[in-house]
Each structure stands twice: as structure tokens, then as C-alpha cells.
């Protein structure tokens, strides 16, 4: 007797990427992804746990090539390395999109000259 296998697909959109969700939640802050130490378990077949000493992902090739996803230090794929999102604070006055995302708030000039002139006008 043959068994039948039914494959179900979800109609929902895929969940957002974690890095994009963090950047969106921070209100327009800039985020950069860095890959840390390698977490590949080389002794998984034997039931043990052994990792190599690779401390940071170094791409073998340029961005857009196959070598960009392979580590030059340990030879592992980039997905074996720990993903770290480095959040950087961006000046909201640099982009019009950030002002629109803030709900119409007006942003002051962030340059040091304008802040010093604004403080001198309020002091007099």
C-alpha cells in the first residue's frame, strides 16, 4: 500500500529579518551587520562538540561573488558565524524620509554652528 504525502504551503508573508526589525524599531537608526566567531560543530557526527578557533568572518571574495559567503580563515559558510547587529545613531535631519517617519516633526539643524548660535540667541 502506498502512502501519500501532502505538502502544505503557508499563504502568509515570511517574517521580517531580525536586523531589519531592529533597525525599523529604532526609528530610522542605521544598522550594520558583522559576523563574529565561528559556531560550527566539527564533531557533531561523533556526538561531541568541537569548534575551530576562528574568531571573525573574513570573506574570501568580493561582494556578489560565491567567495563572499565563505570564510577565508576557517573555510565555513557565513551562516555558521555568529551574527551581530551594530546599531549606529544617525542624524535625523540628514534624510527627509526620517522626518516623514517621525510624524511631521520638524528637525533642527544638527551642525555645531547652528546649535551654538541657537544657544546664544536664547541666552540674550
UniProtKB/Swiss-Prot annotation:
Q: Tell me where on the tree of life, at the top rank, the source sits.
A: Eukaryota
Q: Where are the zinc fingers (ZF-HD dimerization-type)?
A: 35-84
Subcellular location(s): the record lists: Cytoplasm
Recorded GO MF terms? DNA-binding transcription factor activity; transcription cis-regulatory region binding; zinc ion binding
Single GO biological process annotation from the record: regulation of DNA-templated transcription
- Entry-linked InterPro entries: ZF_HD_homeobox_Cys/His_dimer
GO CC term, one of those recorded: cytoplasm
Outline the subunit composition. Homo- and heterodimers.
Q: What does this protein do?
A: Inhibits zinc finger homeodomain (ZHD) transcription factors, by interacting with them to prevent both their nuclear localization and their DNA-binding properties.
Q: What is this protein called?
A: Mini zinc finger protein 4
Identify the gene encoding this protein. Answer: MIF4
Amino acid at each position: 500500500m502506498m502512502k501519500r504525502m501532502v505538502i502544505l504551503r503557508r499563504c502568509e508573508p515570511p517574517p521580517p529579518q531580525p536586523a531589519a526589525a531592529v533597525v525599523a524599531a529604532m526609528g530610522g537608526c542605521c544598522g550594520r551587520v558583522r559576523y563574529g566567531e565561528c559556531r560550527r560543530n566539527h564533531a557533531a557526527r561523533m556526538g561531541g562538540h568541537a569548534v575551530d578557533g576562528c574568531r571573525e568572518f573574513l570573506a574570501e571574495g568580493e561582494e556578489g561573488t560565491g567567495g563572499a559567503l565563505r570564510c577565508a580563515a576557517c573555510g565555513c559558510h557565513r551562516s555558521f558565524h555568529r551574527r551581530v547587529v551594530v546599531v549606529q545613531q544617525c542624524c535625523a535631519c540628514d534624510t527627509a524620509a526620517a522626518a516623514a517617519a517621525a510624524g511631521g516633526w520638524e528637525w533642527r539643524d544638527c551642525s555645531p554652528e547652528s546649535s551654538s548660535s541657537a544657544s546664544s540667541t536664547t541666552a540674550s
